Amino acid sequence: MLSDWTSIELATRLRTMNRILDCIVPDPPTEAVDDAIEIVLKAVGRQEMTQAVTILEEVVNTNPFWLRGYLLLATIYQYVQYADQAIVTIEKGLAICASGLRLFSAPKWIEAVERINGPVVHNRIRNHAERLRRYERMFRHRLAMLQVRCGNLDEAIEQWSAIEEVHGA
């Protein structure tokens, strides 16, 4: 009975997370990703966590820049008491954010963008960089909370410091 309640709670949390992320950091709509999320939610509802994890891992491995997938996957790992795997997943998402942000701040990239004479292009690039920064903050926050739960207080403080540093910049 308790496991039924937990799977319903997890499915509700994943669905709610997905809706909130649609508002905060909307992804371009793709039928394949929407279908994958629906299949994952149904699998969680049936308590088939292995299937849900496998599907999310496949989608993230196919498209490593689908940052939402890392958050959803880490949430499932956290609910099935695999905190270490949740941490690894969040760290992977954080690494993807960092590589994207490095790309946007590279001198050659900035020079190339400055030569483009179009406000629409500049706007899209700024929006994408802001989207990466939002995900980075979410990943760092989530990682800090997971580190606290695991008793890794030094690592948690490191993440909180990085969050403060980003907000101060």
Task: Please provide the spans of the model-predicted regions.
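TPR-adjacent "capping" and linker segments in tetratricopeptide-repeat scaffold/adaptor proteins
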Residues: 18-35, 125-136
